[in-house]
Amino acid sequence: MQRAAVKEHADYAAEVFLRGIFAYEEIEFTLEGRADGIFTAADGVTVVDEIKTTACPAADITPDFAPEHWAQAIVYAAIYAAQHELEEMRVQLTYFQVDEELILRFERHYTAQQLQEEVEALLAEYAPWARRAVEWKKARNSDLQAMQFPFPAYRPGQRAMAGEVYKVCRDGGRLLCQAPTGIGKSMSV
């Protein structure tokens, strides 16, 4: 699909990595991914092309076939528009129907402001979950900081095991520990 697009659009860039930081309420989101393609249309408007392969019947593939595909491409377009200070962009979904070897394309035009608003709407849906995750991490970290080691000193063999675990974490590799019950293996690790 991308090779054919390169023939059609000389400036077609495939697999373009994009990363953008978006703030929603008090949460900062880093959104990233690879746009399947980005090119300039004949009218000078930049297009983000998101390619999907499907075995669904071609008759079922409509512009509203999969809203999540639009969402993905819109996020890429919002990032690209912001990074390149573009006032408008087009988002194109390209579906390749494998059984019929049929290509279907759908396009939508957006201003940079509309793209930003679309991303904010997505983040509004995701924010409650993200907020709970942030709160849980804060509580976990606070509990871990307050946690006391259960014994006043290392038990026999415990310090050596903790040192070996540290070395494996630092250098990579695997470690197999065999020690009697009650030595404090879990706490050492």
List where the protein language model places each region:
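Acidic-basic catalytic patches of nuclease active cores, encompassing PD-(D/E)XK
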Residues: 1-22
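Hydrophobic helix-cap positions at the C-terminus of alpha-helices
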Residues: 4-5, 80-83, 168
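Polybasic (Lys/Arg-rich)
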Residues: 113-146
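Short, charged/polar micro-motifs that form catalytic or ligand-binding hotspots
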Residues: 62-70, 148-151, 179-183
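Motif I (Walker A/P-loop) of helicase-class P-loop NTPases
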Residues: 185-189
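Conserved pre-motif I regulatory segment
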Residues: 134-180
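Short, highly selective alpha-helical patches that border small-molecule cofactor pockets
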Residues: 1-2, 73, 77, 162
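Mg2+/Mn2+-dependent nuclease catalytic core
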Residues: 20-117
